[in-house]
A protein has these predicted regions:
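Extracytoplasmic electrostatic interaction patches
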Residues: 92-161
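N-terminal export/targeting and maturation segments
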Residues: 18-92
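A generic short-segment signal for beta-strand/edge and adjacent turn/coil regions
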Residues: 14-16, 29-35, 112-113, 122-127
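Alpha-helical interaction segments
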Residues: 9, 22, 105-108
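N-terminal Sec-pathway targeting helices
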Residues: 1-17
Length: 161
């Protein structure tokens, strides 16, 4: 019985270690995939700039995801099936929000060819895809994603105030 308990504890410990490694390795992919409602391929290069951490976690973040040509083709097929992704150009009001909030450290280049996605993450959002609803509130929590098909780069910008 004692030998059985030792083996059981060892197995449980190994499972916990494997789970922690999994979370550490794949958390970003799953988190950003949930924001844009489209799976990001594993093992793509991800760069992050984040100014969150102020009062109540206020700040902005920009994530750049670099795709290979093959990954980009698959990703485009997936966003074509998602009705909340739209072809560029982006609505002027969203482009203004993007340009007015981005700092020198966090910037998105002007993109001519690609797709865009908006998600209102505010707790009072009635339609999380309707960007007009966010203007009547004292705070904003939203994400804008832009996929550049010329350079195969996905930009995910998030603002929390």
């Amino acid at each position: 019985m004692n030998k059985f308990l030792k083996r059981l504890c060892l197995i449980i410990l190994l499972l916990i270690i494997v789970y922690i490694i999994y979370l550490y390795t794949f958390y970003d992919y799953n988190f950003y995939s949930s924001i844009i409602e489209t799976p990001i391929p594993m093992f793509t290069k991800i760069e992050e700039k984040d100014t969150h951490g102020g009062f109540h976690g206020d700040g902005e973040a920009l994530v750049k995801v670099y795709f290979s040509d093959k990954q980009a083709e698959k990703f485009i097929r997936k966003i074509d099936k998602n009705i909340h992704w739209n072809k560029l150009p982006m609505k002027d009001i969203l482009q203004t929000c993007l340009n007015n909030n981005i700092t020198d450290e966090i910037s998105v280049p002007i993109i001519e060819n690609g797709y865009w996605f908006f998600l209102d993450r505010h707790s009072k959002a009635t339609n999380k895809y309707n960007y007009y609803d966010m203007f009547g509130r004292a705070s904003s929590n939203y994400s804008i994603a832009i996929f550049d098909i010329d350079s195969n780069v996905l930009y995910i910008y998030s603002l929390d105030t």
